[in-house]
Amino acid sequence: MGTPNDQAVLQAILNPNTPFGDVVGLDLEETEEGDEDGVFPQAQLEQSKALELQGVRAAEAGDLHTALERFGKAISLLPERASAYNNRAQARRLQGDVAGALEDLERAVTLSGGRGRAARQSFVQRGLLARFQGRDDDARRDFEQAARLGSSFARRQLVLLNPYAALCNRMLADMMGQLSAPSNGR
């Protein structure tokens, strides 16, 4: 199987268009969840998760009004749980309420203590909003936090925000393309 470093080198050789070190499967080392759901009463937690799932399904179906209503109920049920704020932020962003989305993301990061799945997703969402607003330094900070929590998407965004790394990846991709292309006339 090889060491993680060996896997990263092979990944760079075989898939030069992906950021160096972005190895499929290595993200599994992160501690899953870590959102401390165990501190909530089980019955309320199950009800809150069911409401969130209904909200996610409604948002995926384009029914943002219902999604926001379900996320709001989940928040009312367990106001100290970060996940519903993160999900509501996504629905608010889709609705065009960037300020509301940012408020929810701030709350999710605070409640999660910057740890676990909800924090990782919140940092990614907040980083994307900052990037769309042209606040690249803020985006970079959020993507760095998300990457530390195991987000391969955040690592790719960091590469895109780093012009030198992007140039190196492009040059490597070009060289690999030239090496693998059949020669004309040979």
UniProtKB/Swiss-Prot annotation:
Keywords carried by this UniProt record: Phosphoprotein, Repeat, TPR repeat
Protein's UniProt keywords contain Metal-binding: no
Keyword Phosphoprotein found: yes
InterPro entries: TPR-like_helical_dom_sf, TPR_rpt, TTC36
Swiss-Prot/TrEMBL GO biological process terms: central nervous system neuron development; memory; negative regulation of proteasomal ubiquitin-dependent protein catabolic process; negative regulation of protein polyubiquitination; tyrosine metabolic process; visual learning
Modified residues annotated as Phosphoserine in this record: 152
Renumbered ranges of TPR repeats: 48-81, 83-115, 120-153
Pfam families xref list: TPR_8
Family, as annotated: Belongs to the TTC36 family.
Protein name: Tetratricopeptide repeat protein 36
Gene expressing this chain: Ttc36
